[in-house]
Amino acid sequence: MVYITYNTPETVRQITFEELMLGVDIPLDSLRSGGHGSTRTVVCSKVPERIMKITYLDAMISQLKMFNTCYKDLIDYPNKWELYDHFEIPKKTGGKMRPIDAPHPELKKALAQLKDMMSGWMFADHHTCAFAYVNGRSTKDAVIKHQRFRSWYFCHFDFHGFFPSTTLRFVLKQMEEIYPFNLILEDPIGRRELRRALSLAFLNNGLPQGTPFSPFITNVMMIPFDHKFARLLNEFQSGKCNPDGTPITDRICYTRYADDIHISCRVFFNYRKVERELIAMLHELDAPFTLNTEKTHFGTRAGRNWMLGLMLNKDGDITVGYRNHKILKSTIETYFKDRRNGKKWDEEDLQKFRGNISYYLSVEPATIAGVIQKYNAKYGADLLTCISNDLKPKAA
């Protein structure tokens, strides 16, 4: 069994995989791009002949050999801990800190090269339900999927130890069913070289957070899980029945953002049964990480329905929340008053302020633009221009 994932640009959106394999007049290389992050995953007993014809296995193994030769000193470095800077940043949810292992420049370069090389071998490197670390996708895009589904009931699940618990053994096991890595692993030399190259990406037998490779490889290894779980939820039988005794099927929307899973439905559903199915699927995959059941949360749009730092409210609108609106208005007011009184803000504070404004504008463009215009009129100045001017280096 092999999972093949490809991008779905408009030209192939209505064409089945079987039609593509039968020789529809569309070059298969066109499946490597387009679709704005939307992909399709199919499961085959083996890699189809048409795909095998454009799969250059010997070249892939040669690239792995060259990579391993080029970065031999890094791969064999006795204490990889010394190749990283280690620090902590606050989690968005507040309270706890998130450990970050930032690779030194040479290692970062090597891991970025490994990511680009492996990603280039695939038609697409993520399932369509995965939204984290995907070009052209954001947290808002994940929430929009649930918004378009017109869901009312929501449940959030969280994986425990997603990055630090992921082992090289688990990644290789998953790759045995993911094209084209399954072909590389069938070759003894390919298996040896792939294992050696991947070993560079691990620290203390886990994936470090802070490298360009860890996010990529988690999306790849989760393709089988995402595919199975999405199919399960597409025809989920929660135990309810029609008057004639036939089971009621609830179609459930599913998105995954790294270790955050969100599911939603237009009608009430048995989220505890979903939780049990999720745990069973992790056991089936022999996953090294677990479900943090203490963080499972079920609710409706009528309540505080936060998703990935955004709120999908009872009216079906995506917002940054009332409290963030209030803080933004207060900060703008303070900034304009300080500027009028000649009090300068630190560069770090200005950068953070501008970043927050940019993010809020991406979430609620009309609402936030209206807030800014209100204060621009009140103080007779353009907020964003003022911030840019204050960030310009002053002449010596």
Where are these regions (language model features)?
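Right-hand nucleic-acid polymerase module
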Residues: 1-91, 95-204, 208-211, 216, ...
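Short beta-strand
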Residues: 252-256
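Short beta-strand->loop micro-motif that forms the acidic, two-metal-ion catalytic signature
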Residues: 259-266
